[in-house]
Amino acid sequence: MFAKWAVLCVLIVPLLPAQEDSMPGGPSGLRCEYLTDPVGIDVPQPRFSWVLEHAARGERQTAYQILVSLKPDLTDGGQWDSGKVSSGQSVHVVYAGKPLSSGQTYYWKVRYWDSGDRASPYSAVARFETGLFDAAEWIGKWIGGANQIRKEFTLAGRPVRARAYVAGLGYYELRINGRKVGDHVLDPAWTTYDKRVLYTVYDITERLRPGANAVGVMLGVGWFKARALRLQIHAEMEGGQTVDVATDGSWKTMPGPIQSDSVYNGEGYDARLETPGWDRAGFDDAHWKAASLTDGPKGALSAQMMPPIRVVDTIAPLKMTTPHPGVYIYDLGQNISGVVEMRVRGPRGTRVQLRHAELLYDDGTLNVENLRAAKATDVYYLRGDGSQEVYQPRFTYHGFRYVELTGYPGAPKFDTLRAKVVHSDVRPTGGFTSSKQILNQIQRNIVWGIQDNLHSVPTDCNQRDERMGWMADAHLYAETAMLNFDMPAFYTNFLRDIHDVQAADGTVTDTVPHRYGSRPADPAWGMAYPLLTWYMYEYYGDRRILEQHFDGVKAWTDYLRTRSRDGILDYSYYGDWVPIEKTPGNLVSTFCYYWSADLVSRMAGILGKGGEAESYRKQADEIKTAFNAKFLNPATGVYGTGTQTAQILPLFLNMVPGDRRGGVLGSLRDDLVYTRNTHLTTGILGTKYLFPLLTETGNSDLAYELATQTTYPSWGYMVENGATTLWELWQNKTGPSMNSHNHPMFGSLGAWFYNALAGINLDTAKPGFERVVIAPQVVRDLKWAAGSLDTIRGTVASSWSRSDNGLRLEVTIPVGSQAEVRIPELGLEPVTLSESGRAIWKDGKYQSGPAGVTGARESDGTLVVEVGSGKYAFAMASE
């Protein structure tokens, strides 16, 4: 997968400005509710987004027209013809046509008019399909039984259209007429089952045939810790007849070859118990038992509108060793989430065992101590019919780099095992690379660590007896995830998960779904609710998310107020987790309380709730005053006990009184550089906010030195000690305590690579990258850096390289967006700046000329250039 991600990060080839009479191209990248051609959405008024295409610079959309129809050729907009709508909006356009029906496929296309009122061609036709809007439309009943369930049915002919609606808990695999349907694994996504159960819609038209058909479902316990199935098939026949098949007491069930399955402990599979043909018509199920009707979970059925978990890559081992006779250790060379596919041939009943771990002992044997109670072991009993047998677990996953193979009949080969990388299939959308190899490896480790921990919820780790949606981890690496992957549908679902656990008193929980940890959440953990809501608005311009979760975020903030005393929030469980130096918990909690109130005020202002915006602004100001009175030492001029985090947090949110800011910042800088020899002592919160703070205050060189540090504690120290993902602790620990070696909560650094080193930043005043700020930090010995990001509006990219006499910067801005490009003068004077060979700054003045460039000015050693959409190649040099 990393290779796929890496190709996204390329140096931009500058293009000459397009001719002014260039015509607009047809829109691309059509999305419905963030998804491409989704099958099964249950939003009555879905939103449409598209990417504008235009060869000319400085272009924008002035109007659009959307057609929606039941006809795939879209000869008319029978469902909705928006007409020509004068608007620059190309994201989150709300459907406003005839009411949508359940279980229906709709086709849509869009065109737009550019700044010259020239119409583009229509886009290619996209589609979306609705799920079931009304609970009464579910005719299938919840049934239970053993882990294999089947049903046969007859069709008079071949259907013209057929769909399966499936909710299977904890996990399921759907099979029709002997073959698996779809490529999802570990489906459905984990939710709070008492509130919400997700179902998936499958197009099974080509799987059904005239005559007898069979549907089979394998069930695993997953996070539900039981097995339950609700399914219905709706087939439309020629002539308009319909056939419905739904779960009820007539379905048959029998235990299958999966003898045990556990997320933590692994899977036990006895191939001797396979019953060939059980998922085909004509199978003799006379000895199978009738499935039992059950109440099922209490939660409402909801469409799974997010990227599913899939096998996204296959990795061959790097090497195989034999530390003891009969014990074979395979090294993948990379810490992953997933399972192993094994090929084996041998006597019937032979027991083969696969154990998984992140670490080895010095003697080369498997070290499973840090897995704690998780056994992470898959066991396979051979069928023994003389053929080659292939085994891959279905209802578990592991976090591992090493696999121990024992009990194998004969001598295994190098290719006996292959690893399958398994996680939520979020599309890579970003890339970063630079001239500094340690940064590139850290970026690689961050990307692997995040993707390994996206398993329908953002987890803390992927290997031990935990793997929870810890809320602090979720919000701390969220921005990095958004810069590297296509995350909006994933986080939309997770915000619903948070809403599902919220109690009437406003409290949320440390983990979501809630299986472990406290209620109420630690304030720093509860920050996931306001921050993820806010990030969805900033990165994707999603106002509907603000509308949906404003009351919930406000309720959480109101709860914090009930726990505060004179503006100070004293309760704290974790605070700035896993630091080198501990910061007082009440300082961290009060910081979070202030930020929650501040965000509620900002959200209220955006939503037109002026009274609440003013009220929560006043509340935030009162908290800030109390914070400074409590924690700022007037004698020493530092906060709390003087830790780095205690200074970082108030500096980051501009809570420090103006006359004290310089002193607090100076104390922080002195501690970093002199006291700690350019090392940090922060935990996960302080680390997240340190790097943007240093950049904002003109200390990017120091941030770079910290980021490239290779001695303890640092990311480079992890790399130097063989890490291929991020550790839970700064220390390199391998014992049975808290020491995961795949824990992305320190991955917040990755956002700084994009924001500072590549210089790609959003402007909250124009969210969703409608306005972009390109501000690369040209630091120390870094010779070049490049970053690219597929935003909801199109590609934003920035690539720079420097020489002794200047700087080259290449920039891409999406059609419909504008940008402020900040080019550091690097102490050169006087400077000239050209774009595609034409001067735009000379003799201290802006020189008009190139298309798309609308102005330039000089500010504090930086040339600030205003541009519209397009690709630009800037060259700065000394005159």
Tell what function each PLM region has:
Residues 4-14:
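Bacterial N-terminal signal peptides
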Residues 269-270, 465-466, 471, 484, ...:
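C-terminal capping/lid segments that line or modulate ligand- or cofactor-binding pockets
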